[in-house]
Design a protein with these regions (language model features):
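Low-complexity, charge- and small-residue-enriched intrinsically disordered regions
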Residues: 48-51, 55-57, 117-129, 159-176
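Beta-strand/loop substructures that line and gate deep hydrophobic ligand-binding cavities in soluble
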Residues: 77-149
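Short, exposed beta-strand/loop patches in secreted or surface proteins that constitute
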Residues: 38-42, 60-65
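Hydrophobic pocket/interface hotspot
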Residues: 18-25, 62, 71-73, 99-101, ...
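Hydrophobic ligand-binding cavity/cleft-lining segments
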Residues: 1-44, 156-183
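Short, surface-exposed coil-to-beta transition loops
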Residues: 4-6, 55-60, 81-86
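Short beta-strand segments that buttress and anchor functional surface loops
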Residues: 46-54, 72-78
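Short, conserved beta-turn/loop elements at beta-strand boundaries and strand-helix junctions
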Residues: 66-71, 94
Length: 183
């Protein structure tokens, strides 16, 4: 089955500040990944082409990386996923800046069922939380998409009843706040 899944937000912010969020992925200062409610994104080395890692059961490596602009991750797991996902900044003069996450893959074997039943709803919720985290990190009011009942059930089952509830990413990294506190 062919899959194309896109999540995006128009952000009223300088593209360089948005690009810094992409560059912060998997770092202590990560201002894009919703680590407050989802498994952290981790890699075997600093963010760069070839870095291997993932989040939870989703495994991948950095296939392409243009600092401040885009990053693409190539799936290595779970079995049944062949493709990539990544973030990019889409901007043009006189147009709003868009932060976009694209997942494009073919599913086969167990992925044909696991994608629509488990991974897609979880992915959709995670990506919406990621974009809300970006908004908070940029000092913008976040657009929160409430988790579906199915996502809440999946999180409860997967965490054996210990899953964290959805929260506003108020503790997301904000570089301007950090500079003000330091100065």
């Amino acid at each position: 089955m062919e899959v194309l899944n896109i999540h995006e937000r128009e952000l009223d912010a300088d593209p360089m500040r948005i690009g810094a969020l992409i560059d912060s992925l998997a770092s202590k200062e990560d201002g894009l990944w919703p680590k407050h409610v989802w498994p952290r994104m981790d890699f075997d080395r600093p963010l760069g082409v070839g870095a291997k890692g993932g989040h939870g059961p989703i495994r991948y490596f950095v296939q392409e990386y243009t600092p401040g602009k885009s990053i693409r991750f190539r799936f290595t797991g779970p079995k049944g996923f062949d493709g990539y996902h990544g973030y990019e900044i889409v901007s043009s003069p006189q147009q709003p800046v868009i932060l976009r996450h694209t997942l494009k893959m073919s599913t086969y074997g167990s992925g044909i069922l696991s994608w629509p039943l488990v991974y897609r709803p979880m992915h959709d919720a995670l990506m919406e939380d990621s974009l809300a985290t970006a908004q908070v990190s940029l000092g913008l009011h976040p657009t929160i998409q409430p988790w579906s009942q199915w996502v809440r059930i999946l999180r409860w089952v997967i965490s054996r009843g210990k899953g964290r509830p959805q929260t506003t990413p108020s503790n997301a990294f904000n570089s301007d706040d950090q500079k003000q506190r330091a100065g």
